[in-house]
Amino acid sequence: MEFRQPNATALSDPLNWNVAAEALKGSHLEEVKKMVKDYRKGTVQLGGETLTIGQVAAVASGGPTVELSEEARGGVKASSDWVMESMNRDTDTYGITTGFGSSSRRRTDQGAALQKELIRYLNAGIFATGNEDDDRSNTLPRPATRAAMLIRVNTLLQGYSGIRFEILEAITTLLNCKITPLLPLRGTITASGDLVPLSYIAGFLIGRPNSRSVGPSGEILTALEAFKLAGVSSFFELRPKEGLALVNGTAVGSALASTVLYDANILVVFSEVASAMFAEVMQGKPEFTDHLTHKLKHHPGQIEAAAIMEHILDGSSYVKEALHLHKIDPLQKPKQDRYALRTSPQWLGPQIEVIRAATKMIEREINSVNDNPLIDVSRNKAIHGGNFQGTPIGVAMDNTRLALASIGKLMFAQFTELVNDFYNNGLPSNLSGGRNPSLDYGLKGAEVAMASYCSELQFLANPVTNHVESASQHNQDVNSLGLISSRTTAEAVVILKLMSTTYLVALCQAFDLRHLEEILKKAVNEVVSHTAKSVLAIEPFRKHDDILGVVNREYVFSYVDDPSSLTNPLMQKLRHVLFDKALAEPEGETDTVFRKIGAFEAELKFLLPKEVERVRTEYENGTFNVANRIKKCRSYPLYRFVRNELETRLLTGEDVRSPGEDFDKVFRAISQGKLIDPLFECLKEWNGAPISIC
């Protein structure tokens, strides 16, 4: 992505709207795939204008090596030389000869001492917690600090900041040696940049005695120990403007925003696929994805969400079976699915657009020059402005957080339908997988946890940026709160990962229960058919389609826990069918028919429990001969990931294993990025367009 344009382009697009629009071409999914590709590259080349969210997230995680473009050296040196020459000319420039902020009326000719004092007074953060067991809770997480170092170097490489190239090389060396200065978690309003946290990077570079860092193995190092380990020869004596160049920028807020958006983009794609999986396992009607509906609404996010769901559902074995079931009994479920399923593209579409727009906004920010003053060597002047105002970060993060909360709300609505036997089209209550529902409450605890997660997520959706307080003696009277909003959004991402984990395990549980349902129903059909033939060997029961129709229409989990009970729904409905047929017979044959009904029920009462137990045992041992339909679906890679790669299985009350143990496995894998490949595999055949309606 290019941000500094040649003159011809600048003249044709002076407001940069065309460049911004160009960046939105293509699908969101392709953009996310590119983001992941950037993340997985082994090297990040910094030149000042082409840094991506994926690269920032990668460096944050400690992955690639960072290299500086030699082409940037000349511009960086020119701005640094200009500062020194301006001092010699007695040019009055903010932060070089003046005090800072509301104290800019003050003057000094001791430029180096001024920078040293700047770093000293900005080292105002608090690391202490008063709790020895939690001694890092007031420290910015290491990944965010690494990302901030990268972004600050990228900004300074553009040659408008008056800093030596050697300082940028030193920061890069520290990054590549996995040495990370400790920064305070709080204390910045991201206006005049992230002054307080960035001052600790500057303090580390000049060897301040209070500076500490985390080494490659997690050990705490002093600045001296770290420099020796990295092979950096000595601390820096800051020249005029260099301290200000290091601290006066939005790097910390945009760093955390970048890592947040990397995860958020993946989670929104997951929510699209998960909604399609929900439709599959709920025996939903796929017409909600029909392209005409979404084409007429015009919103690109909605159209893409529907197209992705349509792709997952196209050819799905569950969808084919559901169509068959709907034909057998059109009144078994509502004509239209509920909103959490039917309007999921309309719900997710705006969230996709918001997160995509936020991603572009932050990507522009991390490639921007955002300090003050800016050194314009070509015009031989310093320009005093306010690019340090991190409003794009605060606004983008507030919007992202609201989108994440909406995604979580949809996920919760789908989850609560899935575990409720009044809504889930025949699955057991709480998705209980055991033999005795009175001793197996399945995901009941998980539903409570999901309510908790969702409530917290909705609370976090409240905006941060409207809580501005005036600072620096009313010099910073409006400020972005960019890092605070980024931190809050990072919390929201964690909670949405918890929800995604719980929901994905629940979907896999539901798919397995559909499989068990199919095996059990087949076995019950065979028992009822055999018994009807052997016991009801009189007219009108030689053709027993009506009897099997009852079996096919009745939800198997409504009776399978106690199949021998004469009061279970299956037995009652079979009895009604037989009574109706018996009463329709000539008067002389009625008594014989009624005697057959009793024998029929007695035989079922004897055979069904044995057959149900045999099927359950075979299912548990994996010796059944009915394939799981999920293997014939495009959503299978996610199921395989949870069941095979992470070694989870159907949860039952008979197993000592708790749901939380499986949730831990899945959450850890999601946090490690292992969800990405199976997620993309679900969509590997999608051509980026809806199925044609012509």
Swiss-Prot record:
Changes after translation: Contains an active site 4-methylidene-imidazol-5-one (MIO), which is formed autocatalytically by cyclization and dehydration of residues Ala-Ser-Gly.
Residue location of crosslink 5-imidazolinone (Ala-Gly): A191-G193
Protein biosynthesis as UniProt keyword: no
Catalytic activity of the protein: L-phenylalanine = (E)-cinnamate + NH4(+)
Keywords (A to Z) from UniProt: Cytoplasm, Lyase, Phenylalanine catabolism, Phenylpropanoid metabolism
Subunit structure: Homotetramer.
Protein name according to UniProt: Phenylalanine ammonia-lyase 3
Lineage, highest ranks first: Eukaryota, Viridiplantae, Streptophyta, Embryophyta, Tracheophyta
Gene: PAL3
